[in-house]
Curated annotation (Swiss-Prot):
Described purpose of this protein according to its UniProt entry: Has endoglucanase activity on substrates containing beta-1,4 glycosidic bonds, like in carboxymethylcellulose (CMC), hydroxyethylcellulose (HEC) and beta-glucan. Involved in the degradation of complex natural cellulosic substrates.
Superkingdom of source: Eukaryota
Catalytic activity: Endohydrolysis of (1->4)-beta-D-glucosidic linkages in cellulose, lichenin and cereal beta-D-glucans
Species per Swiss-Prot/TrEMBL record: Aspergillus niger
UniProt induction comment: Expression is under the control of the xylanolytic transcriptional activator xlnR.
PANTHER family: ENDO-BETA-1,4-GLUCANASE A, ENDO-BETA-1,4-GLUCANASE B
Coiled coil ranges: none
Name of the protein in its database record: Endo-beta-1,4-glucanase B
Gene Ontology BP term (one): cellulose catabolic process
Broad class of where this protein is predominantly found: secreted
Compartment(s) of residence: Secreted
Length: 331
């Protein structure tokens, strides 16, 4: 999400009225390669390293299983770099944190779904912009080495770079690619852009990202798109029923023009008629352009969301009860 503060308290965003299922949405044949949800919790809180169960939480394998049972085959799993690597980006792991992260990843992949590992750090470590491409490459070489033998694991270079030098964003993404490949990992790599990797600003801000290279040719351009007035994902109010499609149209053309493939790694809208139309319209537009769009993941599931406006956590998350029928159309 655009504003980091939204992650500091699990249920700070308020609540929304649920819209019941059965609104006439006809299930179409599955067209996306990957479709699912973010799994949030391990990146919560401001206490570093913090205490598991007090300051942060790991996703619940049983609710992941529930979502897999609904047909989801993709989960973007958040973690915080400072908790995994408390001393330095190139230092030793906190073994308990790594084990818990791996448990979540295994819960996803044992269920036959794909796990996208997401360092949810906004291009920063200990509050400072990551400026060493060498250290970032080492970070990724080490982490990819942990998961290189699991074909269902994929790697997200970092969540939502923002207010950074554009060449640095490009170079950090390339360093991540280089590190992952140096580890012997051959899975897909999801790269993110500057300005919170927004689809609606991608063409103006992140055009240089087309210059990334990968010997495996498995780069996926991950963009995020919220549908409220400022695109921050902090309001349950969507601009209009067509805003979803409108905000990704230019990015779609950019992907086509540059022969790239993309993925909407975060999106959401409130459980109301306007947002339901906006989300449905965006997904339908993507479904009609699967030559460039590989899929999407909702923001977000996770055990500590409470009555958060976009919670997809079973059994009673606001979006689980009010938006899941829209998503099920594409499962």
């Amino acid at each position: 999400m655009k504003f980091q503060s939204t992650l500091l308290l699990a249920a700070a965003a308020g609540s929304a009225l649920a819209v019941p299922h059965g609104s006439g949405h006809k299930k179409r044949a599955s067209v996306f390669e990957w479709f699912g949800s973010n799994e949030s919790g391990a990146e919560f809180g401001t206490n570093i390293p913090g205490v598991w169960g007090t300051d942060y939480i790991f996703p619940d394998p049983s609710t992941i299983s529930t979502l897999i049972g609904k047909g989801m085959n993709f989960f973007r799993v958040q973690f915080m770099m400072e908790r995994l690597l408390p001393d330095s980006m190139t230092g030793s792991y906190d073994e308990e944190y790594l084990a818990n992260l791996t448990t979540v990843v295994k819960a996803v992949t044992d269920g036959g779904a794909h796990a996208l590992i997401d360092p949810h750090n906004y291009g920063r470590y200990n509050g400072e912009i990551i400026s060493s491409t060498s250290d970032f490459q080492t970070f990724w070489q080490n982490l990819a080495g942990q998961y290189k033998d699991n074909d269902l694991v994929m790697f997200d270079t970092n969540n939502e770079y923002y207010d950074m030098d554009q060449d640095l964003v490009l170079n950090l993404n390339q360093a991540a690619i280089n590190g992952i490949r140096a580890a012997g990992a051959s899975q897909y790599i999801f790269v993110e852009g500057n300005s919170w990797t927004g689809a609606w600003t991608w063409v103006d801000v992140n055009d240089n990202m087309k210059n990334l290279t990968d010997p495996e040719d498995k780069i996926v351009y991950e963009m995020h798109q919220y549908l409220d007035s400022d695109g921050s994902g902090t309001s349950e109010t969507c601009v209009s029923g067509t805003i979803g499609k409108e905000r990704i149209t230019d990015a779609t053309q950019w992907l086509k023009d540059n022969k790239k493939v993309g993925f909407i790694g975060e999106y959401a809208g409130g459980s109301n008629d306007v947002c339901r139309s906006a989300v449905s319209g965006m997904l339908e537009y993507m479904a009609n352009n699967t030559d460039v769009w590989k899929g999407a993941s909702w923001w977000a599931a996770g055990p500590w969301w409470g009555d958060y406006i976009f919670s997809l956590e079973p059994p009673d998350g606001t979006a689980y009860t009010g938006m899941l029928d829209i998503l099920e159309t594409y499962l």
